[in-house]
């Protein structure tokens, strides 16, 4: 039995956490190459730019064809207004190319939304998706919530939506994976999952988002990984600015997160977990954690977590200035986007065993 087979079998038997020489050498290889989240192509998805080299993707089939060409294992793409005919065509394309498919879907806000939600779940399933990623907020916590009451209302409404969705998921046997989308802190999301107690609702584990909420990225992984269905793979760059710090997705080999350790933990907890690249090519996000307005939605979060985060930013300052793209031409942005994705795919195969 070779080493790869041995490590994979250890995971399947539930003994993947046994002592091994090092996390870098003991990562558990994936069974398929890393997939691509549609947001990795934020500049190219449904783009109207007249680029000969980087034409826009008008639908999921076009995205899937391209991702197959560059060596990805699958895609995670928005499910919205798919017809039964389109779902069938996407299924045929997926089966021909041998890729996996995951959807990204909105949960129902009211009972009146449930029929549409169920139809989208059915169409997703028909196309071959049995995992659907979702978010339960309209934006980033520190931008859209301005009081503890706002946060409490968000949690209440999110739980109500998920309870509307759960019977549909159970009936259709499709899993829903909630992303830590700069809205839920890890403990809050775990509490919600425990309240729901459904085998059909789990987590889309985003490797870097929760840094924006002053959380230690490895602590977030350790708290959420028992519930992981799918992932948003990314590495992060940080640097200080006047009101806090800047946060940016960077190519997987260039950031400060321990990618091998995170992948290993995910595989230990769910041997069928999928790894989907979310390499968003854009200007850095401003995390204004030194401004009073930022703290309006963080009732009860101790100052020590701010201090820890600032220390982390200082210790892991990006090797040069974080990339800025907004001043560049659309053709340049498309080129950088594609090169970033190709670099990440190469890293995932060579360093993470996702091949």
Task: Identify the role of each PLM range.
Residues 40-58, 104-114, 149-153:
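Active-site mouth loops of central-metabolism enzymes
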Residues 4-11, 27-35, 40-52, 60-65, ...:
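Histidine-acidic metal/acid-base catalytic patches
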Residues 16-22, 82, 97-101, 108-202:
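Active-site acidic/histidine proton-transfer and metal-coordination neighborhood
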Residues 32-39, 75-77, 101-105, 132-134, ...:
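Hydrophobic faces of well-ordered beta-strands that scaffold small-molecule active sites
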Residues 76-87, 107-115, 142, 180-187, ...:
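Acidic-and-aromatic substrate-binding clefts and catalytic sites of carbohydrate-active enzymes
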Residues 1-5, 16-28:
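N-terminal twin-arginine translocation
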Residues 27-30, 64-69, 83-102, 116-129, ...:
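Acidic (Asp/Glu)-rich catalytic clusters
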